[in-house]
Amino acid sequence: MDQLAHHYRAHIAELNRRVAEILSREALSGLVIHSGQPHRMFLDDINYPFKANPHFKAWLPVLDNPNCWLVVNGRDKPQLIFYRPVDFWHKVSDVPDMFWTEYFDIKLLTKADKVAEFLPTDIANWAYLGEHLDVAEVLGFTSRNPDAVMSYLHYHRTTKTEYELECMRRANQIAVQGHLAAKNAFYNGASEFEIQQHYLSAVGQSENEVPYGNIIALNQNAAILHYTALEHQSPAKRLSFLIDAGASYFGYASDITRTYAFEKNRFDELITAMNKAQLELIDMMRPGVRYPDLHLATHAKVAQMLLDFDLATGDVQGLVDQGITSAFFPHGLGHMLGLQVHDVGGFSHDERGTHIAAPEAHPFLRCTRILAPNQVLTMEPGLYIIDTLLNELKQDNRGQQINWQTVDELRPFGGIRIEDNVIVHQDRNENMTRKLGLTD
């Protein structure tokens, strides 16, 4: 924690610098950032799990307490309005006493609807950042999530501070332990549901605390890109295992994927080839490289695998140009990572939020930025047997280039995805996932 505390001072200074700059540009007095409010389930007295506003948790690791507020202007000590109601039904959050508290003027709020008493008196010239625009209107904010402010903050959130990088290393370190436990459970015969329990126990986080719903897919379920069903019964024959799962640390996410074959076979060889390709793609990451170019390079590598493993005939460029590789690899190579799993800023060309769209032939690519130091991205190439996409190839001449017998042989295995979390440095890449122990 000492290292985090050391980095945190510079982190807060950088956030204050960003706020001061955008306030000056937009002639605003300051920002009031709302952690959020509970959401009640329809016709029920139970709330959905609370998720804090990412703009709020960028400043401090208060992740589970709604009705909190930050008042910041880039000059004065930030004010934290911390919610501590009188409540005998629920656990009330303790008054914070961690290393970060010295950087905030902390006020305690006992009734959520009394927050106006703590807010600036000239509220009309302050901007509200948060989800609950109705609350902001009642409080008198005329500027609510202004585009110029949001675009500026989102653009700069892609450049991580040393504090943020350290949090993300720790999120990776935690997730690696979960992945190792899940791998062991798979080879010992566990069901998807049981593997999930092994993972959560190893990372020490609940389903609501991990940054996204884990994908725990055995056999053909691995062909479903966002599979979250968790079957309780083990399959009669165990073939493959795809796990896409992360962990959280102080509000920052890791997002890691591995694929395993139960036995040594052709599918296992395909995993080895994909692992080699993924590491080669990571070696291509450096400041100044366009992320879409890495995505296109991935399609070339997938095309070569289709040829090498007798899944298709033709040549590499032809398979890419005809969209055949997109039927086997339909998603993007990766995305920005940080406070959110699919972090903001991936399409931002500049501080004004100028949008750089994904290439028309690759609409699911989530990042079009030019790589720069201190960005963190996922690298997650894949190859799947997805019948709905492959059936489209059958409808035209492209289907003649597919070896359907090989497709049929691989279909029960579902698919492959391998994903690491990588920091781009000025002179090197830091593959946090591999460095912290998940080497295969």
Curated annotation (Swiss-Prot):
Positions with a binding annotation for Mn(2+) 2: D244, D255, E419
Q: Which UniProt keywords apply?
A: Dipeptidase, Hydrolase, Manganese, Metal-binding, Metalloprotease, Protease
Q: Where does Mn(2+) 1 bind?
A: D255, H335, E380, E419
Under Pfam families, the record lists: PepQ_N, Peptidase_M24
State its cofactor.
Mn(2+)
> What is this enzyme's EC?
3.4.13.9
> A biological process (GO) annotation for this entry?
proteolysis
Q: Which GO terms describe its molecular function?
A: aminopeptidase activity; metal ion binding; metalloexopeptidase activity; phosphoric triester hydrolase activity; proline dipeptidase activity
Q: Does the keyword Cell division apply?
A: no
What's the record's note on cofactor binding?
Answer: Binds 2 manganese ions per subunit.
Q: Which reaction does it catalyse?
A: Xaa-L-Pro dipeptide + H2O = an L-alpha-amino acid + L-proline
The record's listing under PROSITE patterns reads:
PROLINE_PEPTIDASE
Q: Which CDD domains match?
A: Prolidase
DNA repair among keywords: no
Tell me which InterPro entries the record gives: Creatin/AminoP/Spt16_N (IPR029149), Creatinase/aminopeptidase-like (IPR036005), PepQ_N (IPR048819), Pept_M24 (IPR000994), Peptidase_M24B_aminopep-P_CS (IPR001131), X-Pro_dipept-like (IPR052433), X_Pro_dipept (IPR022846)
Q: Which GO terms describe its cellular component?
A: cytosol
Please give the superkingdom of this protein's source: Bacteria
> Which EC class is the enzyme in?
hydrolase
Name the job this protein performs. Answer: Splits dipeptides with a prolyl residue in the C-terminal position.
Family to which this protein belongs? Belongs to the peptidase M24B family. Bacterial-type prolidase subfamily.
Q: What is the name listed in the Swiss-Prot or TrEMBL entry for this protein?
A: Xaa-Pro dipeptidase
What is the primary gene name for this protein? Answer: pepQ
